[in-house]
Amino acid sequence: MPTLFLFGASEGGLFDFDATLPLMAVQVVLLTFILNALFFKPVGRVVEEREDYVNTSRAEAKKKIAEVELLETELKDQLKEARLEAQKVILEAEQDSENLYKEALALATSEANASREKARREIDSQRDEALNQLKSEADNLGDLIIERLLAKK
């Protein structure tokens, strides 16, 4: 049976140094160039393009992150300024309210004092008038009593 395998082979078998070995070497080199041209270069190009895309995407992302951070700090500053301005407006409104309250209280107090003073003057006037009337009636009554007493004598 071993002779059956060697039927087509010559004396040296597979390791004969005839034209087969250089032909195989040429086939390997040719296959390498073909694979390089058809497979490795396109795949390498796709990998490089993908790497460039990833690098540019990463650079754009870093740039956008920097822009977002800048906008965030600007917005925080604006928010802080708005809060300070709102506090200032609230404080001014409180002061205005306090001033209006004090003015209204002073006006009400002065009006109450004026009204009380007017009422006191009216009462004094009416009292003086009543006293004068009482005095004149007392004088009249005294005169009447004197006249009656003198008339009886």
UniProtKB/Swiss-Prot annotation:
The keyword Transcription does not apply. Keywords: ATP synthesis, CF(0), Hydrogen ion transport, Ion transport, Membrane, Thylakoid, Transmembrane, Transmembrane helix, Transport. It is a single-pass membrane protein. GO terms for cellular component: plasma membrane-derived thylakoid membrane; proton-transporting ATP synthase complex. It comes from the Bacteria. Pfam families: ATP-synt_B. Its main location: membrane. GO terms for molecular function: proton-transporting ATP synthase activity, rotational mechanism; proton-transporting ATPase activity, rotational mechanism. The chain crosses the membrane at residues 20-40. It is found in: Cellular thylakoid membrane. The keyword Metal-binding does not apply. F(1)F(0) ATP synthase produces ATP from ADP in the presence of a proton or sodium gradient. F-type ATPases consist of two structural domains, F(1) containing the extramembraneous catalytic core and F(0) containing the membrane proton channel, linked together by a central stalk and a peripheral stalk. During catalysis, ATP synthesis in the catalytic domain of F(1) is coupled via a rotary mechanism of the central stalk subunits to proton translocation. Component of the F(0) channel, it forms part of the peripheral stalk, linking F(1) to F(0). The b'-subunit is a diverged and duplicated form of b found in plants and photosynthetic bacteria. Belongs to the ATPase B chain family. F-type ATPases have 2 components, F(1) - the catalytic core - and F(0) - the membrane proton channel. F(1) has five subunits: alpha(3), beta(3), gamma(1), delta(1), epsilon(1). F(0) has four main subunits: a(1), b(1), b'(1) and c(10-14). The alpha and beta chains form an alternating ring which encloses part of the gamma chain. F(1) is attached to F(0) by a central stalk formed by the gamma and epsilon chains, while a peripheral stalk is formed by the delta, b and b' chains. This is ATP synthase subunit b'.
